[in-house]
C-alpha cells in the first residue's frame, strides 16, 4: 500500500506507513511507539532537501528503522517482523533517538514519480483496443480501472515434460483467458530463477502468449537481491523488473498500466509479424523506462 502511494501521490511532504504487530492496549504494543517515531521523523526534517521537499519518498517506520516503501516486506507477525527485501538495502535510517538518514534512495517517488495521479491520461487502450477510463473529472482514480496483475512463479523441475509448448502451462493459459474476458487492463509478473529471472521453455512460450494478447509481462528473480538479466526479456518483449521483488513489481506494473495501457495486439496473436513485434517492443520500452527508474 505504501509503495502504491509512493508511485501515485504527488506530495512534496513525507508520507509514512506504520503497523502494529500487537493490538492496541496489549502489553508490548508497538503501534503507538511507531506513531511517535514517525512524528519525530516528520518534525526532524531529515527528509527535506534544500527546497524543503521530500527527498526520500514514502517510507515505513517500524521499531526504530526507516524502510523505503520500495524495499520493505512483512516477514513475521511480531515486533521487528518487517525486513528489507528486494533492491540492495532498503533501510535508509533509524529513529531510535534523534531521527537520522544514512542513505537517500535514487528511485523516483511521490512528486518525482512519472505515475502520479495528476499525470495519468483520462483513458488508455485496453487489450481489445477499446479505451479504458482511468480517472474521473476530478482526477480521482476510478475503481473500475484498477488493473489485474498476477504472479506466475517458476520452480525448478516443475514442468510437466521437456516440451517447449505452452500447452502444459495451464495456470498461465487460464489466467490469460480470464483476463481476456474480464480485465481490459491486465498483466503478469513472472518470478523466475534467482537472481536472473529465467524460466523454462514452456513457461516462456505461455508468457509470450500473454504479451501477444496485450498483457505486459515483467521478469523478476525470486532471490530478492539481484537484477533480472537482459536475456529474461526475450529480446525486448518482456519488461526487466530491475531488482524488485515480485509483489513490488506487481504494484509498479499496475500503476504503469494506468499510464500506458495494454500492449499493441497483432492481427494474429499466434503469428505476429516483424512489424508487429517491433511495435510491441516500442511499447515495452516505455514500461522499461519506468521500471529502470522507479
List PLM regions with ranges.
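Acidic, glycine-rich active-site loops and adjacent beta-strand->loop/helix elements
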Residues: 19-24, 64-66, 194, 223-225
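Short Gly/Thr/Asp-enriched flexible loops that form oxyanion-binding sites at enzyme active sites
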Residues: 1-12, 199-207
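Short beta-strand segments
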Residues: 16-19, 59-63, 153, 191, ...
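C-terminal non-catalytic interaction/assembly regions of soluble proteins
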Residues: 176-181, 186-294
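Accessory alpha-helical/coil subdomains and C-terminal extensions
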Residues: 68-195
Amino acid at each position: 500500500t505504501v509503495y502504491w502511494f509512493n508511485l501515485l501521490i504527488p506530495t512534496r511532504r513525507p508520507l509514512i506507513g506504520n503497523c502494529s504487530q500487537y493490538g492496541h492496549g496489549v502489553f508490548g504494543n508497538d503501534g503507538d511507539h511507531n506513531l511517535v517515531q514517525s512524528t519525530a521523523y516528520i518534525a526532524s526534517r531529515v527528509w527535506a532537501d534544500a527546497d524543503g521537499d521530500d527527498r526520500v519518498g514514502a517510507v515505513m517506520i517500524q521499531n526504530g528503522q526507516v524502510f523505503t516503501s520500495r524495499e520493505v516486506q512483512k516477514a513475521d507477525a511480531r515486533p521487528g517482523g518487517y525486513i528489507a527485501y528486494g533492491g540492495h538495502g532498503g533501510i535508509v535510517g533509524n529513529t531510535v533517538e534523534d531521527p537520522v538518514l544514512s542513505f537517500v534512495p535514487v528511485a523516483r517517488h511521490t512528486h518525482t514519480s512519472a505515475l502520479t495521479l495528476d499525470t495519468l491520461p483520462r483513458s488508455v487502450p485496453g487489450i481489445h483496443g477499446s479505451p479504458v477510463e482511468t480517472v474521473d473529472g476530478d482526477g480521482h482514480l476510478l475503481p473500475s480501472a484498477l488493473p489485474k496483475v498476477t504472479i506466475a512463479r517458476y520452480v525448478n523441475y516443475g514442468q510437466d515434460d521437456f516440451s517447449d509448448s505452452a500447452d502444459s502451462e495451464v495456470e498461465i493459459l487460464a489466467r490469460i483467458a480470464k483476463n481476456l474476458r474480464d480485465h481490459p487492463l491486465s498483466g503478469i509478473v513472472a518470478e523466475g530463477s534467482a537472481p536472473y529471472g529465467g524460466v523454462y521453455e514452456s513457461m516462456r512460450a505461455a508468457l509470450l502468449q500473454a504479451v501477444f494478447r496485450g498483457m505486459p509481462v515483467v521478469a523478476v528473480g525470486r532471490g530478492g537481491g539481484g537484477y533480472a538479466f537482459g536475456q529474461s526479456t526475450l529480446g525486448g518483449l518482456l519488461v526487466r523488473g530491475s531488482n524488485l521483488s515480485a509483489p513490488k513489481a506487481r504494484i509498479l506494473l499496475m500503476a504503469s498500466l494506468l499510464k500506458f495501457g495494454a500492449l499493441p495486439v497483432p492481427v494474429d496473436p499466434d503469428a505476429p509479424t516483424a512489424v508487429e513485434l517491433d511495435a510491441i517492443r516500442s511499447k515495452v520500452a516505455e514500461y522499461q523506462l519506468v521500471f529502470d527508474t522507479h
